[in-house]
Regions:
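Helix-loop-helix hairpin linking two adjacent transmembrane segments in secondary transporters
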Residues: 1-46, 89, 93
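A membrane-interface helix-boundary motif in multi-pass transporters
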Residues: 20-32, 214-233
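Extracytoplasmic gate region of multi-pass secondary transporters
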Residues: 69-110, 114
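Helix-to-loop junctions at the C-terminal end of transmembrane segments
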Residues: 119-131, 216
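Structural signature of transmembrane alpha-helices in multi-pass secondary transporters
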Residues: 3-12, 38, 112, 197-205, ...
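C-terminal transmembrane helical hairpin of 12-TM major facilitator-type secondary transporters
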Residues: 132-177
Length: 254
């Protein structure tokens, strides 16, 4: 779970570094090489994992009748949409709006990715102590980071620190909600529920990128954080006042 989240966050700064120094064709070539190595590792090295409980299509209603899972799916879609409304265009935002140099843009994106490790650390140390409070703080943090992106963009060090805070919050969200999927899905359906979660997250990536692109085209790139933040506020309110209530009901019944 953490590995997937780190890969998603570190991909942009690493790709930018390769692209700036070796050309963007080489960046895509490196992606292909890494994919080939990963595939070879899975085929020839990775141990075979015994199959778990079988799951049939007739059991799908169990997932869709699960209020907690449905709430998590919806919050995830809104989160991914809000996140990628801003993150998809963060590089030109840092250049054109924040006025950072190329080196500082690369440094900021690297810090963004590295801060994700802190988000994973916070999850491992504090989630089990009070998971409901942890989830609330994560949702509020993501919304706050997006909403503050434009207002503090002219203060260079402040925007760098905000991006670090944002990266930490995003990682904390990813590991938290993937963990929740495993917790609240039926045992036989956990892999299917996780696959649905991944599909919904990717749908959010697409919708967020489209919304951010539309804002850049018809308004200004300055407003991508505000737009993403407004969506994140909706996600936070839904999570805090609806989904957490379902989580508590499920936990009491378990």
């Amino acid at each position: 779970v953490t590995g997937t989240s780190i890969a998603m966050i570190l991909g942009l700064p690493l790709g930018r570094i390769i692209g700036l120094h070796m050309g963007w064709n080489m960046a895509f070539f490196c992606v292909g090489i890494i994919a080939f190595i990963t595939t070879a590792y899975l085929i020839f090295v990775f141990p075979k994992v015994p199959g778990g409980e079988s799951f049939s299509i007739k059991q799908m209603p169990e997932i869709f009748k699960n209020k907690t899972l449905m709430g998590i799916f919806l919050v995830t879609f809104l989160f991914a949409t809000s996140y990628y409304t801003g993150y998809s265009y963060i590089e030109p935002f840092l250049q054109k709006v924040a006025g950072l140099s190329d080196n500082w843009v690369t440094t900021t994106l690297t810090i963004f990715g590295a801060a994700g490790l802190l988000g994973s650390f916070l999850f491992s140390h504090y989630y089990d102590k009070n998971k409901y409070l942890f989830v609330k703080l994560v949702m509020i943090s993501v919304a706050a980071a997006l909403l503050l992106l434009y207002p503090i963009s002219k203060a260079h060090m402040a925007v760098v620190l905000l991006c670090a805070f944002w990266g930490m919050a995003v990682m904390a969200f990813n590991v938290t909600f993937q963990s929740e999927i495993i917790t609240y899905a039926p045992a036989a359906a956990s892999s299917v529920a996780m696959a649905i979660y991944s599909g919904i997250y990717n749908l959010g990536i697409g919708s967020g990128t489209w919304i951010g692109g539309s804002i850049c085209t018809h308004l200004s790139i300055s407003y991508i954080g505000i737009a993403g933040g407004m969506i994140a506020v909706v996600a936070a309110l839904l999570c805090i006042f609806v989904v957490i209530k379902y989580m508590k009901e499920f936990d009491r019944a378990a």
